[in-house]
């Protein structure tokens, strides 16, 4: 991927417009998790430290375009950013009527981009209005890269210079390393409740990986495709044929979709359900498969330890309940111990990484959510394509 990077730009004396993703959650009117704000600080600091003035823009929540309500106000986000930077960060509500006059080192924030008419439709005139504020546009919002919107795509077309911020460049470099030129053997874990939501990812990765580990409800559908009984476990009977095709595709290239030989079952999906380990052949009609068994976990852990690239999306069991967390824990620890370059993404995956204390041992943790999944699917990300066009 060829794109310009913020860290390669001379920003001294310039005004830099940074599209960040500071869409943070609130509880009782206060920010409950500032991870996204902290993740965006590197680009802001780079600009300030190198003599630029900075305008930050972000979305917050899902406001109605053209309407402004108190809960849509980015003022608490600006205040929190200011406290982390040790600066006063003002919110600009009338930036279209009054272009801000800024000095080097100043940091300001535009009001919530999603209240601007034309934002979601990628309106070119709105993109030009954003671009008119700056000498350099920086996209640092990988989490919105799969959407073509005025603050991510149109502005990149219109700005004098358009480049990737520290966070965006890190994401793209890591994803490129994992998917474009992976060191082999390459192993992917794709898990979740439904094949239907991950089918395009499974099909795309089956073309790239040497081993494709599936887990959760997805694995149950693959077990059905192998003719195994899964009791009353979650599965999609209408996708059994698709699952067979993916297994055949992997087998044809000398790879495999290694399925569990033992599982952890319960009679009910509940925090206090009794967990029982069974061979797959012994699963009863009223059993629910809620995790992989210890033998399967050990076999998959060996695959991961021998890998040179690992892509991880989704836990292999109901790890929120400790009695069904063993499989996901074993795989997390195997990835942590592996020499492989590992990249992980998706909300449940990040929660599992945090729970099992392996954050520092994962090569790269993607903040992307939907953008991460679409990259895995092999789809073009509009905001990234816009940066590549400008970097050519």
Swiss-Prot record:
List the GO biological process terms. Answer: gluconeogenesis; glycolytic process
Q: Which residues bind ATP?
A: 198, 320, 346-349
Q: Cite the EC number.
A: 2.7.2.3
Name the chemical reaction catalysed here: (2R)-3-phosphoglycerate + ATP = (2R)-3-phospho-glyceroyl phosphate + ADP
tRNA-binding keyword on record:
no
Per the record, the pathway is: Carbohydrate degradation; glycolysis; pyruvate from D-glyceraldehyde 3-phosphate: step 2/5
Do you know which Gene3D superfamilies this protein is assigned to?
A: Phosphoglycerate kinase, N-terminal domain (3.40.50.1260)
- Name the source's superkingdom: Bacteria
**Chief location bin:** cytoplasm
Q: List, alphabetically, the InterPro entries matched.
A: Phosphoglycerate_kinase, Phosphoglycerate_kinase_CS, Phosphoglycerate_kinase_N, Phosphoglycerate_kinase_sf
Q: Name one GO cellular component term.
A: cytosol
Q: Which UniProt keywords apply?
A: ATP-binding, Cytoplasm, Glycolysis, Kinase, Nucleotide-binding, Transferase
* Residues binding substrate, per UniProt: 21-23, 36, 59-62, 114, 147
* UniProt-recorded Gene Ontology molecular function terms: ADP binding; ATP binding; phosphoglycerate kinase activity
> Where does this protein reside within or beyond the cell?
Cytoplasm
Quaternary structure per UniProt? Monomer.
Q: Which PANTHER family match?
A: PHOSPHOGLYCERATE KINASE, PHOSPHOGLYCERATE KINASE 1, CHLOROPLASTIC-RELATED
Similarity comment text for this entry: Belongs to the phosphoglycerate kinase family.
What protein is this chain from? Phosphoglycerate kinase
Query: Which organism encodes this protein?
Result: Neisseria meningitidis serogroup A / serotype 4A (strain DSM 15465 / Z2491)
Gene of this entry: pgk
